[in-house]
Amino acid sequence: MKKAFFILLATFMPFISLASEKGLDQKIDEAFKPFSDFVSSIVFFEVFEGAPFVIILLVCSALFFTLYFGFPNIRFFGKAINVVRGKYDHVDHSSAGNNDLAVDGDIKDTIADESKEGEVTHFQALATAVSGTVGNGNIAGVALAIALGGPGATFWMIVCGLLGMSSKFVECTLGVQYRDIGKDGTVYGGPMYYLSKGLKEKGFATLGKVTAVLFAIFCIGGSFGGGNAAQSNQATIVLKDLMGLSSTSAGAIIGIILALIIGVIIIGGIKRIASVTEKIVPFMAVMYLLACLYIIFTNFSFIDDAFSLIFTEAFNPKAIGVGGVIGVLLVGFKRAAFSNEAGAGSASIAHSAVKTKYSASEGLVALLEPFIDTVVICTMTALVIIIFNFGGESGKQQFQYGKVEVQEEFQAVELNKKLYKVEKEQIVVNADTIQKTNKGYPIESVATWEDSLGNEVSDRDTTFFIASAYAKINGVDYKKEGDSYIVGGEKHKDFKGKVMIDGKLYEGAGITTQAFS
């Protein structure tokens, strides 16, 4: 154990020194940006505006599996719960005449024998996989979806979660079916194995090897990014806000503490991970749901209004700022895909270690994950945020859906060098305006920006620009017809998904934290 701690500390020391130099996040951004941009341009290629190829692929695949297998998310829901409960664990040692243990014909190989090869139980595998999905997507992702697409995005998250149950069923069944078991009993499984073996069986051995290697590489990258960095980032933001930590080193300290805690757990392998998650995940989920239910029932008078908003805004052709029904649908699907990871393949790595000789039994267990993660927990989070936004009995909204109020400091400098100091000025930015201006600074009171040569500028990378349009800042005219003024400020920022609450800007988990507090 001591050796493990020293290894972790030695690993993090270079990064700590880098953080003091330039900022660790900035160094990482600069190093990975070219590669990230290249991969993003392919994976997130937009088939049409706001619809990345990868989201369409995941949702369409989930729909196909749902139809092909005859709605397994509905037909086998009860059986899945029974498998997790252990109802069929030792059926091979029981009497064939025991009706309670008989399979009713839905799926022939759904009965598990816990005495067979594997390392973890069905419940441990479920808890391990859920521990990787419940978190940032449910807390920050839901807030982002509502901030961007309004309450209607919640409905489409639920739809995506229900369809995703079928994807989880398929990928985790394949994970067990094509797993390898070492001489010491260690289980090796996941998309790396079923892509390689499965495609080889179909006569595409080379393609199988290539896709397996690519998945392994991207899975490692994803575990650093969306799997860990995004989670710890949101946790750090919330902790700093709640505890009033303003030190620049606070984030690094919190990150190192989290890394050490996780390191102690994962060094023990899948057995230790499973033994920890089977205790933590149920407690974590129950505590969060109880907190949600407390808020919901103490504001019970708003329940009907909240559900009404969710359903009506889901089909509102004039949904604010995101392109109507299709826009809201895409916002919901994007956040749900990140939240439950259905179709990503990562869950099958944990599920492949289960003690069973029947692959489909674990597929049934896995289909419960998107239901727990998206249909239950995400819906609870959404209700808390929507109810919070009603503003109590006053009925005044805490923030505007699809909009953000931004406070920034600007300076206007006349060409004869006469200086005008502009106090903090409140600017309302519409999400639709942000989309249309692309990288430009999306200020409604300024139509376009031009450089000193009169060329229109779309990305504010330099310090000063000439405002070519009429600008009224803080009630003072800084651009009159025929006059030239230089307006300076911070470089372009992406304000999509952020909201202003009590004069402070919040995003992601910060919005959810405000709703709870």
Q: Where are these predicted regions, by residue range?
A:
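Flexible loop linkers connecting adjacent transmembrane helices
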Residues: P72-V120, G141-I146, G150-T154, I158, ...
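Membrane-embedded translocation segments of transport machinery
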Residues: I267-E278, F283-K357, E369-P370, V384-F390
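Membrane-interface loop-to-helix entry segments
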Residues: K3, F65, F69-N82, T211, ...
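Low-complexity, proline/glycine-enriched hydrophobic segments characteristic of transmembrane helices
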Residues: K2-F32, G391-F516
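Membrane-interface alpha-helices at helix entry/exit sites of multi-pass transporters
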Residues: D92-H93, S115-H122, G150-V159, K197, ...
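N-terminal alpha-helical transmembrane segments of multi-pass membrane transport
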Residues: K2-S131, L148-P151
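Alpha-helical membrane segments and immediately flanking helix-loop junctions
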Residues: G97-A145, L174, K183-G198, I220, ...
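Helix-loop-helix module between adjacent transmembrane segments
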Residues: F65-T66, V130-S131, C160-G185, S196-N233, ...
